[in-house]
């Protein structure tokens, strides 16, 4: 709300970006969160992100996210001026679990909804709370939240790949649904 709404991604101030490949996580951040660094979690400066994303795409990598095409990629492209994001968008080198489910079923299912009902797991913070927590100095909490979201998306995607089904509560129909997925 402070930046004038979702249509103004160029005005966003990106504080943290995380990636997770199923084994190793990267937290791109310019604040001290070194205590989050583990054998499978790397802490890197935000300035390194564009190089890692470019290398990943050059190696044929695809990005995975929930609502990645409508939110994450435009924010990275417009607010951080990461030019290689255009490659991902133009080449459709991403898997957007939200867009796939929404297109197939005509209803949007949040990451929280799908993860609760499919995996029995939930997000550790609502996305709307992250800027408030960040401004109050909760850099570690926001970094953990971002990394956990990446892990949840990966686990949901993997479950869908292995079982061809994810589960969610349909707000439109007020019932639990098994959603067949092909991703």
What are these regions (language model features)?
Residues 10, 107-111, 150:
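A structural signal for well-ordered alpha-helical scaffolds and beta->alpha junctions
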Residues 113-114, 118-177:
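Acidic, Mg2+-coordinating catalytic module of metal-dependent nucleases/exonucleases
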């Amino acid at each position: 709300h402070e930046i004038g709404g979702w249509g103004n991604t160029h005005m966003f101030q990106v504080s943290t970006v995380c990636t997770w490949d199923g084994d190793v996580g990267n937290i791109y951040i310019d604040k001290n969160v070194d205590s989050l660094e583990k054998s499978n979690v790397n802490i890197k400066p935000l300035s390194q992100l564009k190089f890692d994303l470019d290398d990943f795409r050059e190696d044929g990598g695809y990005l995975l996210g929930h609502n990645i095409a409508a939110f994450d990629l435009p924010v990275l492209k417009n607010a951080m001026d990461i030019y290689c994001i255009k490659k991902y968008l133009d080449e459709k080198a991403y898997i957007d679990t939200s867009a796939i489910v929404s297109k197939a079923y005509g209803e949007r299912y949040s990451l929280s909804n799908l993860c609760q009902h499919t995996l029995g797991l939930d997000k550790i913070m609502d996305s709307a709370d992250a800027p408030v927590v960040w401004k109050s100095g909760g850099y570690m909490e926001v970094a953990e939240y971002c990394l956990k979201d990446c892990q949840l998306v990966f686990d949901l995607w993997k479950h869908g790949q292995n079982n061809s089904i994810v589960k969610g509560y349909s707000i439109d129909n007020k019932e639990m649904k098994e959603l067949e997925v092909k991703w």
